[in-house]
Amino acid sequence: MAPNLRKSHPLLKMINNSLIDLPTPSNISAWWNFGSLLGICLLTQILTGLLLAMHYTADTTLAFSSVAHTCRNVQYGWLIRNLHANGASFFFICIYLHIGRGFYYGSYLYKETWNTGVILLLTLMATAFVGYVLPWGQMSFWGATVITNLFSAIPYIGQTLVEWAWGGFSVDNPTLTRFFALHFLLPFMITGLTTIHLTFLHESGSNNPLGITSNCDKIPFHPYFTLKDFLGFTLMLLPLTTLALFSPNLLGDPENFTPANPLITPPHIKPEWYFLFAYAILRSIPNKLGGVLALAASVLILFLAPFLHKAKQRTMTFRPISQLLFWILVTNLLILTWVGSQPVEHPFIIIGQLASITYFTILLILFPIIGALENKMLNY
């Protein structure tokens, strides 16, 4: 009998082992779809981004006009730009849901997979930040100024570091040029990290909603999960195209329709919605260095998740108190997101401070305590 090329060819057999004959737990739910959705997001962003880069000019005098030119004069340029801008939002929706899933079902116990995932999140955040600067509108410019300025809070080397990052004494042409270079480079770095992320995942195999070993009940990835993934793609690409075609500027800032002007500061400087939770935590501390540390901690805390797991059961499926705490955390993050979009005045300042304290308390103190408590409850 002739050997099956799919299983014998050196390259095809790697694809086969990770996409076709991969043994997959039969009970993974739709929450396990977000990994493949993130893959589609990455592919879409790289394709639309490449097409946009062909018409973009990374120069302070031309950047804004080149984006306007793309939208007006390039065939379907408006569509490519709208898909790229809103694709970023969907990328973050998917990654936040993916992280939430990992947290709920204890997927962080696969430490290598989890840690590469957190590094992927940080790289994605960096990519989105430098990308937001490129259209060179008011919010692009002032967002870049405010966020890069945070590095000056680092003792001793801070100011030097910021001027080195800027390539001058303020955000200007050198900054825009290097941000474009970085925005082009980072997605390929994300692609490489994704490969590592998947390699680690396939070492252990997927977790499942019950958090128990599923070796006794696995099914091939194709056709079952390929079909399920395609359904997921449809359900994500439909709202993305709807948003890009009907309300492309819904999630953007009106300030960005004004070209960057270093002499006029917008009344409310705020990042895109997906960074608002971290921005709210940054603003809630009335000290520059303290705020920067809290901002960093708000994301880096994810690295601690495996060490804060004290429960005997892996997932929260049968842990009602932890479930309640998890949903309080989700609500808390939504409150932080809302506060981050509001001006710095009376009710919002205290709400932001309370929500920030709650965020760290739940993750660092309450989750381990409740986990240990639920272990005790197993005895009764």
From Swiss-Prot:
Membrane topology: Multi-pass membrane protein
Annotated binding of heme b b562, by residue: H84, H183
GO biological process: mitochondrial electron transport, ubiquinol to cytochrome c
Annotated compartments: Mitochondrion inner membrane
A GO cellular-component term linked to this record: respiratory chain complex III
Main subcellular location of this protein, as a coarse class: mitochondrion
Binding annotation for heme b b566: H98, H197
Cofactors, names only: heme b
Cofactor note: Binds 2 heme b groups non-covalently.
Pfam families: Cytochrom_B_C, Cytochrome_B
Annotated residues for binding of a ubiquinone: H202
Sequence intervals crossing the membrane: 34-54, 78-99, 114-134, 179-199, 227-247, 289-309, 321-341, 348-368
Gene Ontology molecular function terms on file: metal ion binding; ubiquinol-cytochrome-c reductase activity
Superkingdom of the source species: Eukaryota
Similarity-based family: Belongs to the cytochrome b family.
Comment field (misc): Heme 1 (or BL or b562) is low-potential and absorbs at about 562 nm, and heme 2 (or BH or b566) is high-potential and absorbs at about 566 nm.
Functional summary from the UniProt entry: Component of the ubiquinol-cytochrome c reductase complex (complex III or cytochrome b-c1 complex) that is part of the mitochondrial respiratory chain. The b-c1 complex mediates electron transfer from ubiquinol to cytochrome c. Contributes to the generation of a proton gradient across the mitochondrial membrane that is then used for ATP synthesis.
Quaternary structure (record): The cytochrome bc1 complex contains 11 subunits: 3 respiratory subunits (MT-CYB, CYC1 and UQCRFS1), 2 core proteins (UQCRC1 and UQCRC2) and 6 low-molecular weight proteins (UQCRH/QCR6, UQCRB/QCR7, UQCRQ/QCR8, UQCR10/QCR9, UQCR11/QCR10 and a cleavage product of UQCRFS1). This cytochrome bc1 complex then forms a dimer.
Protein name, entry field: Cytochrome b
Species whose genome carries this gene: Pelecanoides urinatrix
Lineage: Eukaryota, Metazoa, Chordata, Craniata, Vertebrata
Gene label: MT-CYB
